[in-house]
């Protein structure tokens, strides 16, 4: 087991701010796969506003995952363009 492994609670929101930029895509991928396996059909990834590097990396990841049906900016109360709402496919039984 990796000594650096961090257990992330699986809720409908993942804040990516605590993670190093090099970890963000892997963390998001693992989170999305686990959220999907647990039956979540909508989640929110908080990547921040900044200059958009993390946002674009997250969106490239989302485009590559078969479990992702769609994604879009959150509404203003959910973080606006600093967060991405992700619609996930129903898990297969």
Where are the regions a protein language model picked out?
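Long, charged, low-complexity intrinsically disordered regions
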Residues: 1-93
């Amino acid at each position: 087991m990796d000594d650096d492994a961090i257990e992330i609670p699986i809720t409908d929101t993942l804040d990516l701010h605590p993670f190093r930029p090099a970890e963000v895509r892997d963390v998001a991928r693992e989170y999305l796969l686990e959220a999907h396996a647990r039956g979540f059909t909508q989640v929110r990834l908080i990547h921040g506003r900044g200059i958009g590097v993390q946002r674009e990396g997250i969106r490239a990841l989302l485009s590559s995952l078969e479990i992702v049906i769609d994604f879009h900016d959150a509404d203003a109360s959910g973080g606006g363009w600093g967060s991405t709402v992700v619609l996930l496919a129903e898990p297969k039984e």
